[in-house]
Amino acid sequence: VTLRPPISVVINTLNEERNLPFALRSVRSWADEIVVCDMHSDDKTVEIARAHGAMVCFHERMGFADPARAFAIGQTRHEWVFVLDADELVPRQLAQALPGLITGGTADVFRVPRLNYLLGAPLQHLGWGPDQDAQLRLFKKSAVSITPDIHHFFHVKQGARERRLRSADVGAIVHFNYIDLTHFIEKLNRYASIEARQAFARGERASFRKALVASAREWLSRYFKNGGHREGWRGLYLTAMMSMYRFAIHGKLTELETGNSEAEVRRRYQAEAERYLAEYEGLHGESKAS
């Protein structure tokens, strides 16, 4: 019998006391090491992690998890790493498939299917179906390079072997994602700000044409190519929000290019307010004199 190499599980957290127990319960029976990297939670996340035997490390809050995830992977002891979000879990079917995958010698990096629950229901389309949303989650540390860029986190090194798994064969990570549209829009707004700042730092420039093209592509891809029209009202509204997300990135990038920051706008408004109020100067004295 070939013994599988040990696996380190990495989970990043920020106020995840509701979700984290499910994630930890799904990995504690097979993970050889659990590393929880917490971004200074205000709830009982850290206590829950330690109660389940996890090694806890800390990282500053960045507005998104990717920089902390890179740090957490650096804290692991083992070569094989499985990355899990705090609002995800690993079903038994997937857990049972892991030993065969890493001892089979077919790949150094695996893209694992993910079943997404959004707005209260599991999705099979929209680009968020299990086989549409395969994530790079199981890998040898030596086979990937890691960047802090949002949504562009892992990069497979040249020469590393990559394999995309199918949900019919191994199951899928279960992801309990956005609760409602309010939750969804709040996240999109935050992510759009981060993406705009990173694009600006790279020297990218916005244009109305680019915004229109990106928004239209999102519609065509999610609603038609990836079957969003089959998801009823969820498909329609989620596609609309994602299309608006692309527009928002370019809008926020335009603000950065023009120096139209919050501080600058507040300064401008204050100056305008003072200009209007200057019209009252002397009127109070005149009123009293009369």
How would you name each of these model-derived features?
Residues 1-26:
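N-proximal low-complexity "stem/linker" segments adjacent to membrane-targeting elements
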Residues 260-290:
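Alpha-helical transmembrane segments and their immediate juxtamembrane flanks
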Residues 39, 60-61, 78, 85-88, ...:
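Short acidic donor-binding/metal-coordinating loop in glycosyltransferase active sites
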Residues 66-73, 82, 91-260, 268:
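Catalytic-site signature of metal-activated, phosphate-bearing donor transferases
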Residues 6, 32-33:
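Residues at the starts of beta-strands that form the adenosine-phosphate
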Residues 32, 46-75:
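Conserved donor nucleotide-binding strand/loop of the catalytic core
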Residues 26, 30, 38-47, 61, ...:
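A conserved acidic beta->alpha catalytic loop
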Residues 18-21, 43-52, 93-94:
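Acidic helix N-cap motif at the loop->helix transition within catalytic regions
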